[in-house]
Amino acid sequence: MHIVITGGSGYLAGRIIEKILNSTDHEISVISQKKSSFFINPRVKHSSWNESDKINNTVSSADVILHTAGFNAPESSKNPDKAVDFARKSTKRIIKAMKPSGNSNLIFFSTAHIYKSPLIGEINEDTIPENNHPYALSNLVGESLVENFNMSTNNKGLILRIGNCFGLPANESSNCWDLVINGMCKSAIVNKKINVSGPSNQVRNFVPMKTFLQKLQLVIENESVGKSSHILNIAYMKSFALSEIAELIQTRCSELFNFMPKINYEKPKDNLINLNYQSKYIQTLNKEDDHFLEEIDEMLTSLHQNCHD
């Protein structure tokens, strides 16, 4: 199988490439403006966004295209017009380059945050998006192009609306430490303190990276998953308040390293409704596949080792 991954130097793409290299013999092509340590692997072929002919040849020969490229939330806030423009142009380029035979699958990486801010209440794939944050809007622009693509061709485009992934980056230069759980883990080890910047009772759906990768593998290998809707929510089986996450990390530090980082709550509690973020079309992984604590422990252990090397 030939898998093309856009945004290959990014956080999600890095872990995806690592997983494919370690567990399959699939051919990998990456489209990315930035370089990554993965690109020295002979199994990984690299193209930059300014190499149009190379991109066209790469995408047209693909079995699966994972379109992960895009501005993250902070970048989108700083440059909203550029975020939307990149989402539109990059998605159009990928769609235009896909082979006309209709045998390739396009998987567009979107976000749970397109629904609302903050995420509250019952949310599934039928929920109408209403968030007007630049990050949400740029993702919705890409989604609309994929939906039009599905209506006008025999190709198969699938949209993944992904919860808040967390876990170690595969690439040390990956910009992932501003993510909530990643940032809490790093601060707990480096500063012996956990800062909770949002209301402590705000509830979010956090997805362990290993759980995300398992669900992505299921989507890639089983074309029927999500076929009826062309949209899939990627969710963890339970959502947690920020205070619960902070206390969990505090407890893991005590058990693993025999110290208790202080928790600093920066905002008062808010009158927030609970969150049930779920998918109607992809099964929740069984409890034996639960990687929540495993992902946190691996991140804490790696950070602790780096601080003491």
Describe these PLM feature segments:
Residues I3-S23:
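N-terminal Rossmann NAD(P)H-binding glycine-rich loop of SDR-like oxidoreductase domains
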Residues W49-F86:
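NAD(P)H-binding glycine-rich loop region in Rossmannoid oxidoreductase-like domains
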Residues R93-P134:
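Conserved Rossmann-fold NAD(P)-dependent oxidoreductase catalytic core, especially the SDR/UDP-sugar
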Residues S117, N132-L158, G163, I189:
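Active-site Tyr-X1-5-Lys
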Residues L140, T153, C165-N182, K192, ...:
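Glycine/proline-rich active-site loop of Rossmann-fold NAD(P)-dependent oxidoreductases
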Residues K215, N222-P268:
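Mid/C-terminal beta-alpha module of Rossmann-like enzyme folds, strongest
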Residues A241-L242, N264-Y281, D290-H291:
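Active-site loop of classical SDR/Rossmann-like NAD(P)-dependent oxidoreductases
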Residues D290-D309:
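Amphipathic terminal alpha-helices
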